[in-house]
Amino acid sequence: MKNKIKIRLKSFDHRSLDQATKEIVSAVKRTFANINGPIPLPKKIGRFTVNRSPHVHKKSREQFEIRKHKRLLVIGDPNPAVVDALSKVDLAAGVDVVIELESGE
C-alpha cells in the first residue's frame, strides 16, 4: 500500500509562495522522504471593470486584476517524521495550505 501526501499552496504573492515551498521542501528533505515538486499549477487571473464615476461618463472605466498563484508538492510514502516536520514549519500569513492524504492500493 502506497500513501501520498499532497500539499497545495495558494497565494496572491508569488514571492511568499516560493519562500513557503522552499521551507516545506527543506523540512521534508531533512527527513529523507521522497518529494516531487514544487509543481507550478496554472494561475487564476480575476479581472474586474468598474466605472470611474458614480453618476455619468459611462465610457470612463477602470480595470483591476488579481492573480492567484498555486503550487503542488507530492510526498511519496511518508513516515511519521515527515508529518512531525510539516507540523513544525512556520509559513507566511498570506499563504493558504491544503493538505490531502491519499492512500493507494
UniProtKB/Swiss-Prot annotation:
The keyword Lyase does not apply. The keyword Ribonucleoprotein applies. NCBIfam families: PRK00596.1, rpsJ_bact. PANTHER family: 30S RIBOSOMAL PROTEIN S10 FAMILY MEMBER. It holds the Pfam family Ribosomal_S10. One of its GO terms (biological process) is translation. The gene is rpsJ. InterPro entries: Ribosomal_uS10, Ribosomal_uS10_dom, Ribosomal_uS10_dom_sf. Belongs to the universal ribosomal protein uS10 family. One of its GO terms (cellular component) is ribonucleoprotein complex. This is Small ribosomal subunit protein uS10. It comes from Rickettsia conorii (strain ATCC VR-613 / Malish 7). One of its GO terms (molecular function) is tRNA binding. HAMAP family: Ribosomal_uS10. Keywords: Ribonucleoprotein, Ribosomal protein. Involved in the binding of tRNA to the ribosomes. Part of the 30S ribosomal subunit.
